[in-house]
Swiss-Prot record:
It comes from Rattus norvegicus (Rat). GO terms for molecular function: calcium channel activity; identical protein binding; monoatomic cation channel activity. This is Transient receptor potential cation channel subfamily V member 2. It is found in: Cell membrane; Cytoplasm; Melanosome. The lineage of its organism: Eukaryota, Metazoa, Chordata, Craniata, Vertebrata. The keyword Phosphoprotein applies. The gene is Trpv2.
């Protein structure tokens, strides 16, 4: 028999001539067919197969003297599927003889569903009764006795929706531990991947669980199945196994988390159980350090996807006893509600590439990412960085303010357009200073342009997220482009430099709001303006432009049909006023779409007048259109805009502190990764500390960050501490006290600081 790891030998299937070889292809809309449905029969369509027709093979002549060998009863797919779905093993009698007589196997296309590739074993597992089906073991034994080179137990679905789905996956989904044991004992591969479209994360109906049987059991909260798959003596599952995306079972658990209390509790329980199981089965493997194809560990994946609850748990996970090395938080000292904790900064600090801080600030698509930066240790870590870089932030603010004052003075004292851009040798002092101002403006524009290009280049892989979230960066880039272009046109003595110059000046003063994020109250005000413009105002303008264009075209069309000056105003009129000498005929009020749009805009802001020229032929229709426009825009759209803006402002105000923290985090990381500052080596926060001993006896050293907390909710819980008092490391005789080793890039004497008075935000 061919081994499970080697590919099966090539063979032609056989046909006894009575099979329905229908190979129709459904060219309509492709939708995932049901794996099992009581309201729909199995699909008979299948891909074309080259088979050997046994009816064309000459049988040996019958020996009249010898007893004749009777041909066994015929088993087709419908009969076999009916038997296994009802769970009647007695009706499988004669199946083995029929397979041998016709050189068939249970994995042949004659015994699989055409649309999905479902086998009779899958059919049996799909129709369990009280978690069992009496036909499963006979099918496995018949398949083994028939000498099938391709084991039935490892047969997989072949269609694009359920590709790779196996009987083991189905047994796990049916939550039958007994069936799982039966399949594994009979050679089921525990590392088969279900990689069809239904099992991939995309829009529409799908269920991504990590493709592997172990991941499916973990994501469906079956700890007994998980334990069996990891500890069975036949083929133990590997915790390091990955799917087609490079995700392990821990990644899969992060992906199915949805931040609800019930789901989070189950995911966290399973996550911790797998970590502890991994520590027992493979103590040398760091499961949380395994990255997928995107370079994301489970912690980084939770940060990118915005899975706040599982992200909080991983950051603040604390174990005691033999599983303490799995912790990322270590209680160093506590007194009542006051607790001093050490947090593991691996993969968190921006000192490392693709850190958690950078992912939250620049690569996270979740609208609630501001809730992650206020979690410990990120909150205190960002505050530590801000305190260190705040002088640089205000230095940049002062330089930009001086630059804008120079820009304003130069723009205000612009000479007439007919004067040369470069003054002659007899130029006055004012003209020389004006030329110097233009040169400084050009240099500043080039500096801003290089800085913004560097910003977007570093985020080129996440360009869509960058454009959606980099409001001020886009404005700075536009300002820099206009500034450089205006100065080039200025030295080329082109008059169009002036409009570009004033546009750049306006953008420059608007961009001054960027530096308000250094203060909480002004920073939140800036965020409110940004959210209102990007969310509410853009939607309002889209609808408003549709109304404006439609009504403008209608008014222009009606204005062309003016009454003849000699025609009477009505039937009773006999005298028509003639224009006097020197008096020109009054033009139509809406001569073009632009004029009509400007007049209609006045109605939108409440400054329009309903008076119109008497020579209009359809005055009633024009009046009706104007009244409808006022109702739709001035009354309806403007009030909807005000209501939406109020809702946005209230939402931002409710989360003002966390949103401001996110703005500060972005500013801190931008200063660390700036065009000039990034040339220096980044500062690493925290210190290298010994927090315990690993299972192999080696010291467990982590780069940790100390955080002082006050927690009245859980202060009665007794946790093991690393120190007996807050005097810091170095106390002789304390075997649990961490011995610190100052690193090259370590923080200043952080470990020796006494406890300070704590202030809640």
């Amino acid at each position: 028999m061919t081994s499970a790891s080697s590919p099966p030998a090539f063979r032609l299937e056989t046909s006894d001539g009575d099979e329905e070889g229908n190979a129709e292809v459904n060219k309509g809309k492709q939708e995932p067919p049901p794996m099992e449905s009581p309201f729909q029969r199995e699909d008979r369509n299948s891909s074309p197969q080259i088979k050997v027709n046994l009816n064309f093979i000459k049988r040996p002549p019958k020996n009249t003297s010898a007893p004749s060998q009777q041909e066994p009863d015929r088993f087709d797919r419908d009969r076999l599927f009916s038997v296994v779905s009802r769970g009647v093993p007695e009706e499988l009698t004669g199946l083995l003889e029929y397979l041998r007589w016709n050189s068939k196997y249970l994995t042949d296309s004659a015994y699989t569903e055409g649309s999905t590739g479902k086998t009779c074993l899958m059919k049996a597992v799909l129709n369990l009764q009280d978690g069992v089906n009496a036909c499963i073991m006979p099918l496995l034994q018949i398949d083994k006795d028939s000498g099938n080179p391709k084991l039935l137990v490892n047969a997989q679905c072949t269609d694009e929706f359920y590709q790779g789905h196996s009987a083991l996956h189905i047994a796990i989904e049916k939550r039958s531990l007994q069936c799982v044991k039966l399949l594994v004992e009979n050679g089921a591969d525990v590392h088969l991947r279900a990689c069809g479209r239904f099992f991939q994360k995309h829009q529409g109906t799908c269920f991504y669980f990590g493709e592997l049987p172990l991941s499916l059991a973990a994501c469906t909260k079956q700890w007994d199945v998980v334990t069996y798959l990891l500890e069975n003596p036949h083929q133990p599952a590997s915790l390091e196994a990955t799917d087609s995306l490079g995700n392990t079972v821990l990644h899969a658990l992060v992906m199915i988390a949805d931040n609800s209390p019930e789901n989070s509790a189950l995911v966290i329980h399973m996550y911790d159980g797998l970590l502890q199981m991994g520590a027992r089965l493979c103590p040398t493997v760091q499961l949380e350090e395994i990255s997928n194809h995107q370079g994301l560990t489970p912690l980084k994946l939770a940060a990118k996807e915005g899975k706040i609850e599982i992200f909080r748990h991983i950051l603040q996970r604390e174990f005691s006893g033999p599983y303490q090395p799995l912790s990322r938080k270590f209680t160093e000292w506590c007194y009542g509600p006051v607790r001093v904790s050490l947090y593991d900064l691996s993969s968190v600090d921006s000192w490392e590439k693709n850190s958690v801080l950078e992912i939250i600030a620049f690569h996270c698509k979740s609208p609630n990412r501001h809730r992650m930066v206020v979690l410990e240790p990120l909150n205190k870590l960002l505050q530590e960085k801000w305190d260190r870089l705040v002088s640089r932030f205000f230095f940049n603010f002062a330089c930009y303010l001086v630059y804008m004052f120079i820009f304003t003075v130069v723009a205000y004292h612009q000479p007439s357009l007919d004067q040369p851009a470069i003054p002659s040798s007899k130029a006055t002092f004012g003209e020389s200073m004006l030329l110097l101002g233009h040169i400084l403006i050009l240099l500043g524009g080039i500096y801003l342009l290089l800085g913004q290009l560097w910003y977007f280049w570093r985020r080129r892989l996440f360009i869509w997220i960058s454009f959606m979230d980099s409001y001020f960066e886009i404005l700075f880039l536009l300002q820099a482009l206009l500034t450089v272009l205006s100065q080039v046109l200025r030295f080329m003595e082109t008059e169009w430099y002036l409009p570009l110059l004033v546009l750049s000046l306006v953008l420059g003063w608007l961009n001054l709001l960027y530096y308000t994020r250094g203060f909480q109250h002004t920073g939140i005000y800036s965020v409110m303006i940004q959210k209102v413009i990007l969310r509410d105002l853009l939607r309002f303008l889209l609808v408003y432009l549709v109304f404006l264009f439609g009504f403008a075209v209608a008014l222009v069309s009606l204005s062309r049909e003016a009454r003849s000056p000699k025609a009477p105003e009505d039937n009773n009129s006999t005298v028509t006023e003639q224009p006097t000498v020197g008096q020109e005929e009054e033009p139509a009020p809406y001569r073009s779409i632009l004029d009509a749009s400007l007049e209609l805009f006045k109605f939108t802001i409440g400054m329009g007048e309903l008076a119109f020229q008497e020579q209009l032929r359809f005055r009633g229709v024009v009046l009706l259109l104007l009244l409808a426009y006022v109702l739709l825009t001035y009354v309806l759209l403007l009030n909807m805009l005000i209501a939406l803006m109020s809702e946005t402002v209230n939402h931002v105000a409710d989360n003002s502190w966390s949103i401001w923290k996110l703005q500060k985090a972005i500013s801190v990381l931008e200063m660390e990764n700036g065009y000039w500052w990034c040339r220096r080596k980044k500062h690493r926060e925290g210190r290298l500390l010994k927090v315990g001993t690993r299972g192999d006896g080696t010291p467990d050293e982590r780069w940790c960050f100390r955080v002082e907390e006050v927690n009245w909710a859980a202060w009665e819980k007794t946790l093991p501490t690393l120190s007996e008092d807050p005097s810091g490391p170095g106390i002789t005789g304390n075997k649990k006290n961490p011995t610190s080793k100052p690193g090259k890039n370590s923080a200043s004497e952080e470990d020796h600081l006494p406890l300070q008075v704590l202030q809640s935000p």
